[in-house]
Design a protein with these regions (language model features):
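PLP-dependent enzyme catalytic core of the Aspartate aminotransferase-like
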Residues: 3-7, 189-198, 204-238
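Structural motif of enzymes handling amino- and sulfur-group chemistry
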Residues: 89, 116-139
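Conserved glycine-rich beta-strand-loop-beta hairpin in the small C-terminal domain of fold type I
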Residues: 122, 126, 141-151, 163-176
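A short linear hydrophobic-aromatic micro-motif
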Residues: 151, 160-163, 197-202
Length: 238
């Protein structure tokens, strides 16, 4: 399916989420290498969004696109997810092809407010990457435990789900299809009765029908409330 899409002449760019959001999929090096070969074959440029690169769990390992890249490509990322600094609006990118890089820089300099990054964002990123490793390690353990808590509670309440934590990200992509619920009815119950807003899967297209995306990147006390309210909302419809 991917090769068929890349072979179409109207498709010029592959937008890649690595790790993938919302599923939490970690692409293996072999998978990425195959993608790179196909993109080079059909002259398709790649833009790889790797903002969740630090949030990879267990034995899974993140492979940056730069390690397998061919042809035209860009790798975009930020410390905002890892260090909770999105309000500083800082991000950075790598562009492998010199002509593309120079063209991008030229276009960037012609845009008001974009030609120079925020000094505060730069300072925060430098500090985070130079001194934040112990904090990030602790955060990773905390978030991984949060995801295990979700699995424990959901599977305890609804064994047929058999939900497993994702390979990456602190976002729980939960398949509720075994429960045969109406997505919009569940959202109505969660918001109006349980007072909790959880991202419905249909926000991401028809493939997301029957799923919800729960953010585990928060204090355990808040997560516990959210999970218990999700369980209560589901029970209301069963």
């Amino acid at each position: 399916a991917l090769e068929a899409a890349l072979a179409k002449p109207e498709n010029k760019i592959l937008l890649l989420w690595s790790p993938q959001n919302p599923t939490g999929k970690v692409w293996t090096r072999d998978e990425l290498t195959h993608m790179a070969e196909l993109c080079a074959r059909y002259d398709v440029a790649v833009i790889s969004d790797e903002i969740h690169m630090d949030m990879v769990w267990g034995e899974h390992r993140h492979t940056p696109w730069s390690a397998v890249a061919r042809g035209k490509w860009a790798l975009l990322t930020s410390g905002s997810k890892s260090f909770n600094i999105p309000a500083l609006t800082g991000a950075y990118g790598l562009i492998g092809d010199e002509a593309s890089r120079n063209g991008y820089l030229s276009a960037l300099k012609g845009r008001d407010g974009l030609s120079s990054p925020s000094v505060l964002a730069l300072t925060a990123h430098i500090a985070a990457y130079q001194q934040g490793a112990p904090w990030l390690d602790a955060l990773r353990h905390y978030l991984e435990d949060n995801l295990l808590y979700i699995a424990q509670e959901l599977n305890g309440a609804f064994p047929e789900l058999n939900w497993q934590p994702p390979e990456a990200t602190y976002l729980a992509w939960i398949d509720l299809r075994p429960l045969n619920l109406d997505d919009r009815s569940l959202q109505k119950v969660l918001i109006e009765q349980q007072k909790v807003a959880i991202m419905p899967g249909y926000t991401y297209g028809n493939e997301g029908n029957g799923f919800v995306r729960l953010n585990a990147g928060c204090p355990r006390s808040k997560l516990e409330q959210g999970v218990q309210r999700l369980i209560a909302g589901i029970n209301t419809l069963r």
